[in-house]
C-alpha cells in the first residue's frame, strides 16, 4: 500500500500557484546585455533564469573596486539572485591596452571582501599561469585562501599545460571547443561550462556519455541585447542542447 507521508519541518501554502525550478547561469557577464541590473533581471526572470554568477571584468577594467562595489549594491535587492566573481585578469592584455585598474593580490583581497562576491572571475591569462608568473599566481592564491571557487578560461590549453592550470586550483572552464577537450577537462576534475556557440552534436554526445554528469552545465557567457530579446537567455541554450540530442 501507499507509504505514510513524511513529516515536514516547514509547510508553504502556494496559493494555487505552481512551484517550478529555475535556471542557474554559472558563467556570464551582465555588461554584455547593455542593460542595467534591474532591467536585465526582468528579462532573465521572464526566461526562467533565477540565479546568475556574473564576472564584471568590463566594469572592473574601467572603474576598479568601486565599480564592482557599485554593481554589488545595485544587485542586492533584485528579484534575480546575482552572485559576483572578483575579476582576476585586469587588465586582460597587459601592455596592449590602457586600463583604468590593475588587479594584484591586495586588490583581489579587497574585491573578495565585497558582500555578494562569491568567487574568482575567469583567469584569462592562461599563458601567465602556465609560465608560473608570480603576479598572476599570487592573485589566484589570494582567492584560494578565501575558500571560494576559481573560474578559468583555458580554450588553448591541453596536456601538461592544462594539468598545470588545474593543479593551481582552477575549478572550471567555459571555452570547450571539442568533444575531446570536454572529456580531457572532465578527467582532470574541471567543471565544464558549455556555451551555445560551442554546442554541436559531437559535444552533446560527449556530454551524454560522460561518466560525471554533475560537472557539466550550460551557460550563456555573453548575450547581447538583440539576441536576449529575440532568443531569450539560458532557456535558449537548453533548447539548443535538446535539439542536438
Give the residues covered by each predicted segment.
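Divalent-metal coordination cores built from histidine and acidic residues
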Residues: 38-147
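Di-metal (Zn2+ and/or Mg2+/Mn2+) metal-binding site signature of metallo-dependent hydrolases
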Residues: 17-41
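Glycine-enriched alpha-helix->loop->beta-strand junction motifs that scaffold or abut catalytic
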Residues: 49-50, 116-117, 147, 164-172, ...
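Divalent metal-coordination and catalytic microenvironments
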Residues: 16, 27, 48, 71, ...
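Hydrophobic faces of well-ordered beta-strands that scaffold small-molecule active sites
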Residues: 22-30, 52-54, 82-86, 118-122, ...
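His/Asp/Glu-enriched, well-ordered alpha-helical/loop segment
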Residues: 208-245
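Divalent metal-binding pocket/active-site signature
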Residues: 121-180, 196-198
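Histidine-rich, glycine-flanked metal-binding segment
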Residues: 1-21
Amino acid at each position: 500500500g501507499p507509504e505514510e507521508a513524511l513529516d515536514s519541518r516547514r509547510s508553504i501554502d502556494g496559493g494555487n500557484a505552481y512551484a517550478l525550478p529555475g535556471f542557474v547561469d554559472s558563467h556570464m557577464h551582465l555588461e554584455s546585455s547593455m542593460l542595467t541590473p534591474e532591467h536585465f533581471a526582468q528579462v532573465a526572470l521572464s526566461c526562467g533564469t533565477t540565479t546568475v554568477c556574473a564576472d564584471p571584468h568590463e566594469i572592473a577594467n574601467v572603474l576598479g573596486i568601486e565599480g564592482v562595489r557599485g554593481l554589488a549594491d545595485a544587485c542586492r535587492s533584485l528579484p534575480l539572485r546575482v552572485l559576483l566573481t572578483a575579476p582576476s585578469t585586469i587588465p586582460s592584455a597587459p601592455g596592449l591596452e590602457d586600463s583604468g585598474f590593475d588587479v594584484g593580490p591586495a586588490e583581489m583581497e579587497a574585491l573578495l571582501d565585497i558582500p555578494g562576491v562569491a568567487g574568482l572571475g575567469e583567469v584569462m591569462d592562461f599563458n601567465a599561469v602556465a609560465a608560473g608568473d608570480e603576479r598572476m599566481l599570487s592573485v589566484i592564491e589570494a582567492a584560494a585562501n578565501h575558500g571560494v571557487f576559481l573560474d578559468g578560461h583555458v580554450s588553448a590549453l591541453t596536456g601538461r599545460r592544462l594539468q598545470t592550470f588545474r593543479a593551481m586550483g582552477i575549478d572550471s572552464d567555459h571555452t570547450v571547443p571539442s568533444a575531446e577537450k570536454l572529456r580531457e577537462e572532465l578527467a582532470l576534475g574541471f567543471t565544464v561550462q558549455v556555451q551555445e556557440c560551442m554546442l554541436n552534436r559531437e559535444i552533446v554526445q560527449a556530454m551524454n556519455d560522460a561518466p560525471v554528469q554533475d560537472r557539466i552545465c550550460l551557460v550563456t557567457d555573453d548575450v547581447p541585447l538583440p539576441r536576449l530579446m529575440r532568443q531569450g537567455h539560458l532557456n535558449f541554450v537548453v533548447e539548443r542542447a535538446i535539439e542536438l540530442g
